[in-house]
Structures are given as C-alpha cells and as structure tokens.
Amino acid sequence: KAPPAAMAALQNPYDTAARQEAAPDALWDVAYYNGRYYVYFGIVPCLLFQLPFEALTGIQDLPPSLPMILLAWLYIAAVFGFVRQAVRRWFPDASAAACLLAAVGAASGAQLWYLLHRPSVYEYAILCGAVFVLWALWQWLLAANTPLQKRGRVLFHLTLGSLCMALVAGCRPQMVLFAVLALPILWPRYITEKRLYTR
C-alpha cells in the first residue's frame, strides 16, 4: 500500500494530530521515509506462505489467518514435544499426567489465542517467530537427550534446531535472544563432558 500523498507535505509525519488530520488512512505500524513505507517485520513468513501461495494460485494477499492456523498447530506440537523432552531431561520421575498437565498449561497460557483472535501482519510475525523458537528448543533438547551412539540423529536434531533459531531472526529478530537457552540445554554434554574437543 502506498502512503497517502498528504504525508509528504507534513513537517513531521510522526506527529499524531497532524497525521490524523492530513492522512487518516495512513498506516502506523511501519516506518515512513522519503515517501515510502518500510516494514520492519521479518520476511520469513512471507517466504514460507505468501510467495508459494501466490506462485501456485496467482492470487496475491493470502490472509494471515490461514497460515496462522497452521502455525498454531505447529506451536502446540512444539509445546508438547518440548515439555516431554524437558521432563525427560530434568524431571525423569514425573508422571505422564504431570507431563500432560504441564504441556496443556504451557499451550493454554501462551498468547497463542490472542494472536489468533487478531490475525494481522504483526501477530503473524510474532507467532511464526514463537513457533521457530519452540521448535529450536525442542530439537536441541532432543539432541541432548539422544544417546551419543546415534550420531546421525543427534546431528539432525542439532541442525534442525539451529536452522529454526536462525529463521527466528527473519520473523521477529529480538526473539533470537531465546538462543541463550541453548546453554543450559547443551552445556552438560558438549562443554562439561568435553564432547566438542577433538581427541
């Protein structure tokens, strides 16, 4: 969407009162510079959903609500997988009921339902980033919980987790800070036990 021509005449396009009067239909959640809008959201959701949809159907502007439903299911799957692996790693004596309650609580207590209630570009990028964060943490936990003799599986989970965390930067860059959680997950095996060192 092109910015309204009236915005170019404003001395300060970020002055709320002046902008509402001159260009009431202008977008707010974007950067405006030299007569153009710039979106600071990541490009990954567009590359994963919008572009393939347009290439297959020729229809532009896939509504964010459709891919967000798929992302919500991927989020819930990642929550259950992450909780299962976390319980296996740190609470091996926990019952299956406790594990199930923790997973249901984590999925229900997330902002997932709010994001689905208001499917827009902003919420789309947040949900996509959250999905990749949880999938990364889940895969790293799977790698940490897999016996070292199964090197192929360990490498697969480490690689998939790292790819997911890299994709987070293309959704909501500030969510990459969750990568620090790799330390408590991977530290015991790769630092304490010195598995990164060559012999």
Region annotations inferred by a language model:
Residues 177-199:
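Perimembrane helix-loop-helix junctions
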Residues 63-92, 135-139:
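Transmembrane-helix motifs of polytopic, lipid-linked glycan transferases
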